[in-house]
Each structure stands twice: as structure tokens, then as C-alpha cells.
From Swiss-Prot:
Record localization: Cytoplasm
Main location: cytoplasm
Taxonomic placement: Bacteria, Bacillati, Actinomycetota, Actinomycetes, Mycobacteriales
Gene symbol of the encoding locus: clpP1
GO MF entries: ATP-dependent peptidase activity; ATPase binding; serine-type endopeptidase activity
One record GO biological process: protein quality control for misfolded or incompletely synthesized proteins
Organism for this UniProt entry: Mycobacterium tuberculosis (strain ATCC 25618 / H37Rv)
The protein's name in its UniProt record: ATP-dependent Clp protease proteolytic subunit 1
E.C. number(s) listed in UniProt: 3.4.21.92
Assigned protein family: Belongs to the peptidase S14 family.
Gene3D superfamilies cross-referenced by the UniProt entry: 2-enoyl-CoA Hydratase, Chain A, domain 1 (3.90.226.10)
Length: 200
């Protein structure tokens, strides 16, 4: 047994919930089940790196039930997904909103799934600006750059023209699992033990 597995398997003192997540981690399953923030991002990035180090040839499954959250934290997760040599299969369950939608669509093409009653929300990246007039101008400029990059990436993930991504993101837009499949956020709707490649 490898050192990293030994370290991960030491579950003494963990709560029942923690023990469940540790058991899932041993099966290469990780969860984003809350708002995306720096703490959550650090945990998910560490788990992805750990699993990739253990076996670069096996998929990692990322289940997402999230209202979204921090852009910088979400982009840290995304960059780690890209960095990992193994495929990252993503699953929408419950709600994949905002940054949750972005990470869902960022999964390995052909391995992006939605459960039948999942809801997906796409909208413009949100960011507040504070400080002096000069600081506000700098923050606004940086936010515009980030927003443009996220539009570009979402267009790449979905196969939609960037102009459509920009237009559809202008206001909150919700998608059912079937609509998300048609739009290109996911590749399959999964029900029980089988996968449906077409909207149902």
C-alpha cells in the first residue's frame, strides 16, 4: 500500500460524515456539495492531486451540488482539473449553478453527466468592487478580463458560439437536465445503472 493511501486511510477520529467522504475518496469519488470558497477549493484541489498521483490512468468522478461562489476559488479547481493527467468525469445532482455550472461543463468531454432532476444555472460572473476610484477602475478592468475568459471557456465547453453564451448569460438562465444536454453542458443524462445520450 502506498504512503499516500496509508495517510488517507487513517480515519481515526473522523465523524460519520467524514468517514463516508473518505470511503468515497478511496473509490476516486469527490464532492462539491456547498458554495465554492477558498477552503472548499483547497480541499478539492488536494484531493484531485492526491488521486492523480496515486493513479494517473483512472478517472476521477466529481459530483456537483453547488450554488456557485468565488470565481478565484472556482478557477483554482478548474486549473487543477486541467493539470491532472487523468480524466475528470463530472456529475450534476440537485443544483449546479454559476461556478457549479462552469465546473460541470469543464469535465472531460464525453464524461459529463446530469442526474434527471438536476438544475443548471448559467449567468454572468458576479463581482463587487470597493475602494477608491482608482481601485474600483482597476478591479472593474480585471473583472471584465475574467468575465471574457469565462465566456470563452463556456463556449469551448459547450460548442456554442461565444455570442450566444454572452447573450444567454445576461440574465439568470436555468436549464433542466434535458436542456443542459441539448445546450452542451453535459453529454449524458444518467438514470440508475444506464446512461441516456438523448434528452428524455
Amino acid at each position: 500500500m502506498s504512503q499516500v493511501t496509508d495517510m488517507r486511510s487513517n480515519s481515526q477520529g473522523l465523524s460519520l460524515t467524514d468517514s463516508v467522504y473518505e470511503r468515497l475518496l478511496s473509490e476516486r469519488i469527490i464532492f462539491l456539495g456547498s458554495e465554492v470558497n477558498d477552503e472548499i477549493a483547497n480541499r478539492l484541489c488536494a484531493q484531485i492531486l492526491l488521486l492523480a498521483a496515486e493513479d494517473a490512468s483512472k478517472d476521477i468522478s466529481l459530483y456537483i451540488n453547488s450554488p456557485g461562489g468565488s470565481i478565484s476559488a472556482g478557477m483554482a479547481i478548474y486549473d487543477t482539473m486541467v493539470l491532472a493527467p487523468c480524466d475528470i468525469a463530472t456529475y450534476a445532482m440537485g443544483m449546479a449553478a454559476s461556478m457549479g455550472e462552469f465546473l460541470l461543463a469543464a469535465g472531460t468531454k464525453g464524461k459529463r453527466y446530469a442526474l434527471p432532476h438536476a438544475r443548471i444555472l448559467m449567468h454572468q460572473p458576479l463581482g463587487g468592487v470597493t475602494g477608491s476610484a482608482a481601485d474600483i477602475a482597476i478591479q472593474a478592468e480585471q473583472f471584465a478580463v475574467i468575465k471574457k475568459e469565462m465566456f470563452r471557456l463556456n463556449a469551448e465547453f459547450t460548442g456554442q458560439p461565444i455570442e450566444r453564451i454572452e447573450a444567454d448569460s445576461d440574465r439568470d438562465r436555468w436549464f433542466t437536465a434535458a436542456e443542459a444536454l441539448e445546450y452542451g453542458f453535459v453529454d449524458h443524462i444518467i438514470t440508475r445503472a444506464h446512461v441516456n445520450g438523448e434528452a428524455q
